[in-house]
């Protein structure tokens, strides 16, 4: 059993900002129900680019719910540009830490803000070459892998799997040549 911080317990048992957001003008989705973690973020952004409100829906564990909850608290009142600077480390720090096997939950929260901001700005994330999906099972993109490795100074395949869930299921993406 994992040891969770008081902040994780609080955000899991009493999550903030849960449910669809009426009037949302940006929505981001990450994860996959097939892998057991999925997150949908709703943002209401002013004409000046300030996030006025944020809510979420998630399917996942205590860490996924807590990461999503704390993210919505963090982004309220921020400009979209400042929200895009939030990393999974910021989310983890706000929660007082997460077990290494649950770091992928903070990465999902970090990734979803980029998806919502892209929708708000009218950018088709699927059109980006960097958005090539590397792990189909966990729906992890090459761009996300590169950033998470850089931000967290990851060195091993096991660390990458803990942080992203890439390679946790069918394992074809970690074999030479991939799928």
Stretch-by-stretch model annotation:
Residues 1-21:
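Polybasic, low-complexity association/targeting segments
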Residues 14, 18-48:
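Structured beta-strand/loop patches that form or line metal/cofactor-binding pockets in enzymes
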Residues 35, 44-110:
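Active-site- and interface-proximal helix/loop "cap" or "latch" segments in soluble metabolic
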Residues 49-59, 125-132, 154-169:
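Immediate flanking context of iron-sulfur cluster ligation sites
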Residues 58-70, 100, 131-143, 164-179:
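Local cysteine-cluster metal-coordination motifs and their immediate loop/turn environment
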Residues 73, 139-152:
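Amphipathic, charged-and-aliphatic alpha-helical interface segments
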Residues 79-82, 153-157:
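Short, charged, surface-exposed loops that flank catalytic or proteolytic processing sites
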Residues 109-123:
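Stable alpha-helical structural segments in soluble proteins, enriched in small hydrophobic residues
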């Amino acid at each position: 059993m994992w040891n969770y911080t008081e902040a994780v317990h609080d955000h899991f048992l009493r999550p903030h900002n849960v449910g669809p957001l009426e009037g949302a003008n940006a929505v981001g989705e990450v994860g996959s129900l097939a892998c057991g973690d999925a997150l949908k973020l709703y943002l209401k952004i002013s004409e000046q680019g300030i996030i006025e409100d944020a809510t979420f829906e998630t399917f996942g564990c205590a860490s996924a719910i807590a990461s999503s909850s704390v993210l919505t608290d963090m982004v309220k009142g921020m400009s979209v540009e400042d929200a895009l600077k939030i990393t999974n480390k910021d989310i983890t720090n706000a929660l007082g830490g997460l077990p290494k096997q649950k770091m992928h939950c903070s990465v999902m929260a970090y990734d979803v803000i980029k998806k919502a901001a892209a929708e708000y700005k009218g950018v088709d994330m699927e059109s980006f070459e960097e958005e090539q999906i590397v792990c189909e099972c966990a729906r992890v993109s090459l761009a996300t892998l590169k950033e998470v490795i850089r931000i967290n100074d990851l060195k091993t395949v096991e660390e990458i799997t803990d942080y992203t869930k890439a390679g946790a299921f069918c394992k074809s993406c970690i074999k030479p040549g991939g799928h």
